[in-house]
Amino acid sequence: QSSLRPGIFSALLILAFQAVMMVLSLLRKGGPFASLRRQGYWWLYVTLFSVTLLFLLLIVFLMRRRRPCLDTFFLPLQTFYTAFLCLWGTCVTLLDQFGGNSLSVFTYVTLSAAALTVLQPWQSALIFTGNCLFLNLLLPYTPAGPDNFYSNAVNSCFVTLGAFFISLWFYRSKVSSCYAKSIIEQQNADIRSMNVQLDQMAHTDELTGMK
C-alpha cells in the first residue's frame, strides 16, 4: 500500500487545485457563466474534481478489501484515470487557444501523467499518442490553429515522445524493482528451508534416524 501513496498525494493535490480554481471562477466578475469559454473551464474543473474524488474513494475502498482485490483493480483504475487526465488537459488546451496559443496545460499534464503513473509500454503509447492526435485534429478549428498548426504539431509530438520515454523508464524501473524483490524473497525462503533442514539434522541420530 505504500506504493499507492504518491498517487494518493497527487490526487489530493489535484482536488485542492481544482477547488481553488472553482472558487476563483466564482469570485471573478460575472462568475463562471459570463461566457461560453468560462463555462467550459468551469465544467472542466468540476468534472476533474468529481472524477478525482471518485478515484480516491475507490482506492480507499480497495485498500480496505483484501490485497488480491487491490492488485486486480488498481492498475486498470489507474490506467483509466491517466487517460481521462490527459484528455482533460487536451480539452483545457483547446479552450486556451481561444485566448492565445499556449500548449502549457497539455505539456505539464502529459508529462506529469507519465511521471506519476506506472503504465505498460503499449498503454502509454496508446494513451499519449491518441491524446496527441486528438489535439492536433481539433487545433485547426481554433482561431489561431491554422496559422500555428506546424509549430503546435511539432511541439505536441515532442511532448508526447518525451512522455512515452519517461513512462517507459518508470515502468522498467518498477519491473526491475519487483523482480529484485521477488529474488530476495525467494532467497530468504530458501534460507529458511535450509535452516529447518539443518535444525532437523542436528536433532536426529545419523545412524538410527531417531531424534
Regions found by a protein language model. Name each.
Residues 2-10:
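N-terminal membrane topogenic signal
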Residues 166, 173-187, 191-194, 198-201:
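Amphipathic coiled-coil signal-transmission "stalk" helices
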Residues 117-126, 131-179:
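N-terminal membrane insertion elements
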Residues 115-117, 206:
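Short conserved micro-motifs on helix faces and helix-strand junctions that flank
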Residues 15-113, 131:
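Hydrophobic transmembrane alpha-helices and their membrane-interface boundaries in multi-pass
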Residues 199-211:
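Conserved nucleotide-binding and Mg2+-coordinating catalytic segments in signaling enzymes
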